[in-house]
């Protein structure tokens, strides 16, 4: 019998742990099995007993934890559940505030051991926030939407999953990675979903499962932050426009070193001027619609068309139709404005002129903003001019493809490249070939720019030679 | 055009019936919006010196196994403006007590941080909003910080 609940804390008086809540949570894990009980081992800890009568993954795991001697210490006090309150802090000062953690035994060398002053495995969780309504995790099947709450029994079961591997010396790799989650967290979230399914089944509702690949969570079940101009212009951080931009940013591009470095520079520039655009929209109500119709929607449409081409494999007439389906309500006037044509401001209202001055001043000068947020808009001009020249949809699609290839090859080159090994650089080039530089011509043009940017970096040149089409001969 | 970082000033520390309230003024003299961590992520208290350090940052946080890695709450302060941040803390904290001879059972120690006579605040800030690092070799959230604003206040015992 090796599972215990801390019922009091020596030296601190009573009232700093909530043992009844922990036992109730164990009852839920046991699915209400009447075979669960406890005895007072000492004034400070209760020993859990379990003569299981029910099946199911959570009761079976609990049975194993309660009725196995793991030999973590000579006293056979292997796992202690410590149901703390919100004023508990760990030895590194970090607050427990809504967290559930597992501390490996002191001296074990496993994660959390240096924060544990005992020879037991401690499962510490904050019991004060009932149903953890303020904590939102990634819901399975949604592409990472963080709106899934976590209850106390689910938190405890998640931690007991970790504890079971700590005491059997079977812990998987633990890292700080959030998305994708580390192997250990992936395993615990997968098992956590057994608990979610058991609770849902007992309630007669469909289970709401957590995405095992995403470990991080946020407070407040709002969407991930993104794109303040689009958010204000569209009126919601959950709008289709913001969702599309967020998906493009996080779903693929920021997962690579090249994409992450690029977005770091883009954010630096974008958040330097976008609050000013937001302030203008706040001061002049009509500007919101202008920004949404003339800039945000055409940009989303262009970026989605680029994605259709690079990741979706669309070509020819299909690409042309897709661009039209995404929508094309940009006008030549806006494009002329963004192209720096001063005459194009003649018919604008005062606020519109102020807005365009802000955009031109920043967008025109910054290569990152220009490449990511302005140049894609000109895809609409390319399509319009091709249509005006009476090209077929197939021919317009080919023209669009050439324009996208040309744009992709001009991806700003970041200074992280020389820090990569040959193998890492090769990985980045392959990533770019998969998601952006999808033709040999685009790869060759980008490869030439990269080689010219770092003429003395051997790893880069070797990687370019390794990868087909990037334009360098092997050494 | 200025490029200064976040500036913090600890305005007041007072004990309420159910909380310790700490009010911090944050200022931004730069030409762009600054983003900062707006919640106390860690509390360090030394009962011997009655020195309380509140960290609005994940710097120094050790790697542990936990149910979810909950990101901090963030706020912004506009260019050339100030904002106030009201931090509500428990009046006492509880933590695991060190044990000279290790035993299997935890011992707790409880401290009244409302008795602090020296209060320090550290606030992590950045020029851009926080977005989770989704790379395979992800860096921890604190890598987002461009700097740390410091403020302190000596509290006179009543």
Where are these regions (language model features)?
Chain B
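Structural beta-strand segments of beta-rich domains
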Residues: 18-22
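Surface-exposed edge beta-strand/loop patches
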Residues: 73-158
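Asparagine-centered strand-capping/turn motif at beta-strand->loop junctions
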Residues: 24-33
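The feature marks short-to-medium sequence segments in extracytoplasmic or secretory-pathway proteins
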Residues: 33-82
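Surface-exposed loops/turns
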Residues: 16-17, 79
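Generic beta-strand hydrophobic packing signal
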Residues: 11-13, 39, 43, 50-52, ...
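N-terminal edge beta-strand
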Residues: 1-14
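Short polar catalytic/cofactor-binding loops
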Residues: 14-15, 28
């Amino acid at each position: 019998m090796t599972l215990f609940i801390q019922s009091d804390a020596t030296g601190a008086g009573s009232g700093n742990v909530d043992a009844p809540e922990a036992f109730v949570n164990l009852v839920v894990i046991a699915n209400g099995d009447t075979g669960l009980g406890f005895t007072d081992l000492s004034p400070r800890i209760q020993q859990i007993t379990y003569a299981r009568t029910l099946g199911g993954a959570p009761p079976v795991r609990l049975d194993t934890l309660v009725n196995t001697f793991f030999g973590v210490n000579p006293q056979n006090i292997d796992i202690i559940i410590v149901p703390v309150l919100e004023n508990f802090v760990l030895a590194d000062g970090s607050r427990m505030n809504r967290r559930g953690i597992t501390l490996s035994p002191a001296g074990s060398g496993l994660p959390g051991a240096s924060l544990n002053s005992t020879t037991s495995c401690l499962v510490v969780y904050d019991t004060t926030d009932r149903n953890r309504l303020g904590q939102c995790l990634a819901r399975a099947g949604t592409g990472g939407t963080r709106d899934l709450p976590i209850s106390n029994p689910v938190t405890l079961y998640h931690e007991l999953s970790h504890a079971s591997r700590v005491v059997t010396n079977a812990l998987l790799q633990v890292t700080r990675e959030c998305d994708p989650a580390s192997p250990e967290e992936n395993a615990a979230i997968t098992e956590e979903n057994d608990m979610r399914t058991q609770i849902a089944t007992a309630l007669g509702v469909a289970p709401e499962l957590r995405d095992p690949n995403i470990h991080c969570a946020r407070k407040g079940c709002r969407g991930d932050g993104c794109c303040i101009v689009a958010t204000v212009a569209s009126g919601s951080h959950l709008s289709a426009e913001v969702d599309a931009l967020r998906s493009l940013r996080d779903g693929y591009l920021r997962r690579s070193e090249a994409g992450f470095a690029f977005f770091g520079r883009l954010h630096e520039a974008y958040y330097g001027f976008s609050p000013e655009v937001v302030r203008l929209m706040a001061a002049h109500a009509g500007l919101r619609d202008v920004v949404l119709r003339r800039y945000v929607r055409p940009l989303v449409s262009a970026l989605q068309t680029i994605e259709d081409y690079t990741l979706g494999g669309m070509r020819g007439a299909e690409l042309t139709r897709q661009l039209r389906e995404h929508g094309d309500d940009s006008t030549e006037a806006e494009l002329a404005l963004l192209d720096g044509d001063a005459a194009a401001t003649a018919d604008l209202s005062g606020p519109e002129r102020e807005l365009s001055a802000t955009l031109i001043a920043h967008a025109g000068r910054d290569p990152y903003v220009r490449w990511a947020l302005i140049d894609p808009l000109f895809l609409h001009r390319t399509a319009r001019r091709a249509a005006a020249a009476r090209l077929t949809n197939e021919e317009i699609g080919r023209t669009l493809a050439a324009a996208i290839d040309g744009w992709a090859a001009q991806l700003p080159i970041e200074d992280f490249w020389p820090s990569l090994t040959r193998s890492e650089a090769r990985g980045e080039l392959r990533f770019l070939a998969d998601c952006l530089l999808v033709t040999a011509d685009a790869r060759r043009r980008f490869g030439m720019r990269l080689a010219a940017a770092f003429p003395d970096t051997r790893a880069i040149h070797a990687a370019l030679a390794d990868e087909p089409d990037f334009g360098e001969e092997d050494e | 055009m200025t490029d200064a970082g976040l500036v913090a000033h600890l305005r007041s520390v007072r004990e309420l019936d159910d909380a310790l309230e700490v009010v911090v003024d944050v200022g931004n003299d730069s030409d762009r919006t600054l983003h900062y961590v707006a919640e106390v992520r860690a509390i360090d208290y030394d009962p011997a010196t009655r020195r309380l350090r509140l960290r609005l940052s994940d710097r120094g946080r050790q790697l542990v196994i936990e149910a979810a890695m909950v990101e901090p709450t963030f706020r912004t302060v506009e260019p050339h403006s100030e904002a106030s941040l009201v931090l509500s803390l428990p009046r006492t904290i509880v933590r695991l007590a060190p044990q000279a001879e290790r035993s299997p059972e935890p011992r707790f120690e409880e401290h009244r941080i409302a008795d602090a006579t020296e209060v320090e605040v550290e606030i992590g800030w950045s020029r851009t909003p926080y977005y989770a690092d989704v790379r395979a070799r992800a860096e921890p959230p604190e890598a987002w910080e461009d700097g740390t604003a410091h403020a302190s206040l000596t509290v006179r015992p009543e």
